[in-house]
Amino acid sequence: MVAYHLLTLISLGLGSHCASALQYGYNQLSTHKDSAVVAGAFPAINGTHLQSPAFTSPGTVPRGFSDGTSGPTRDETMEGFMRRLARSNSWMAYHEADFKSEEGRKFPYMYLSASNSSVENPSSRKLRVWLQGGVHGNEPAGDQSMLALLGDLAANQKWAAKLLEKMDILVLPRYNPDGVFYFQRYLATNFDPNRDHIKLARQQTRDIKELFARFSPHIATDMHEFTAGRTFGPKRDIIYAADALFSAAKNLNIDEGIRQLSEELFAKRMGKDIEAAGLRWDPYITLGESSSSKLLLLEAGTDAKIGRNAMGLSQCVVFLCETRGIGIAGQHFERRTLSGLVMAKSILQTAVDNFDEVYNTIERGIRRFTNSRNDIVLSDKSPVMERTFGMLNITDASLFDYPIDFATTTPAEAVLTRSRPRAYLIPPSWPDIVKRLEVFGVKADKLPYSYVGPVEALNVTSVTFDKEYYEGVVTTTVETKLVERNIRLPAGSYLVKTNQKNAALAFVSLEVRTLYPF
């Protein structure tokens, strides 16, 4: 069998991102608050005491939060809150990343540890947990739930100590400070930060990815919100009833044992914890297109350009956690933030309660993946099944289970596979490709000698360009033919071996037959 795979690329020299109806800054959605009838189905939860700025210091909340033109917590308020917690708790360390946002804003984060560990020097035999919020700037319960978690840990010292016996935690509450400032989904440059995890078009994405790769977490969580008022049904009179939607990473190049741990242990516990808090949940979904009259919902996909899967491809347990909030301004904000907090706490508590199983399963999964000779998955499909989904009737606020077609990815089914290359060869004229791989934490060796020998290569036999820009590029559909050939590459070429922990990120980036490669 041929040992190496030659990377050949089509380069597209394109200008800036082009998207209709976007301006520079303040790309805000219209606000459609729940009616009094619908709002009655989302009451405040008795006994809720959230320890985050929007609730402990309500005077700091901007007026625009109530009408959907601002988030509830300005950068300086958030930073002051985090600094005060760090001053009062020796196990909390306040940091500012050594990079800035596209408009020059800071990235404060908290490192929580009971030892003298750090991002670059973590504790041995402890779980490393990465928690992030605020990826989309108009989803304020995402970062607020992270701040509420920090406040909850500070207020419950025994619980915090119990967690930190088993884990070190990095909390990046605000991934997209420019988006939060403009109260818009996008980065300042109007790129979607949650679609940039493979192509790495923006320096901000690369900087955060490098921090993530250095920390190399066992567990990661990405906090978001979903649209509250989207209607369905023949009369357009039903909406999602859930407070929370969540999903594990689904890409089939993540070790199967890690994926099963996510679904069988973490997801099941999370559902129970959400219900115990008096809240409602369902799996994360998007709307599908169907030729029938039946509603088709698509379970969270396997696409690597999404943060959940991109993080998971570093062989860790990852959850996307979404709360019901886009489009309703500050309505139900306590309940929304509580929903995010419950999910984050569930993940932490599940990991601690099952520490040996979680730690050993992930570490074994990393070793198994690193040494695997199994085929890699280039494309997959989602089997469609019948099930019900929790809905709410907007005319009377009745809750009911609505029959749907459900395209499931638990698990997805592999369609196109190929034998796992031992390595990829990259000519010295493509150092920018190598730099992107290194952002992922993928190691590339620079060869001090010329390479002469057999490789597998893909000859492109046809190319079809899309008619529109997508996130700054024109996407391309190619047909290829696999050929074996002898090549000569000069010294200074790069060898990317696949017996490394983050190799799956090389697979999805370099294999042209995956969905969104370089």
UniProtKB/Swiss-Prot annotation:
Disulfide bonds: none annotated. Keywords: Carboxypeptidase, Glycoprotein, Hydrolase, Protease, Secreted, Signal, Virulence. It is found in: Secreted. The active site is at E322. GO terms for molecular function: metallocarboxypeptidase activity; zinc ion binding. GO terms for biological process: proteolysis. InterPro entries: Peptidase_M14 (IPR000834). The keyword Glycoprotein applies. Glycans are attached at N46, N116, N393, N459. Zn(2+) binds at H136, E139, H224. Residues 1-21 form the signal peptide. Its EC number is 3.4.17.-. Its cofactor is Zn(2+). GO terms for cellular component: extracellular region. Coiled coil: none annotated. It is an enzyme of class 3 (hydrolase). Its main location: secreted. Residues 71-351 form the Peptidase M14 domain. Residues 53-76 are annotated as: Disordered. Pfam families: Peptidase_M14. Extracellular metalloprotease that contributes to pathogenicity. Belongs to the peptidase M14 family. This is Probable carboxypeptidase 2. It comes from Trichophyton verrucosum (strain HKI 0517).
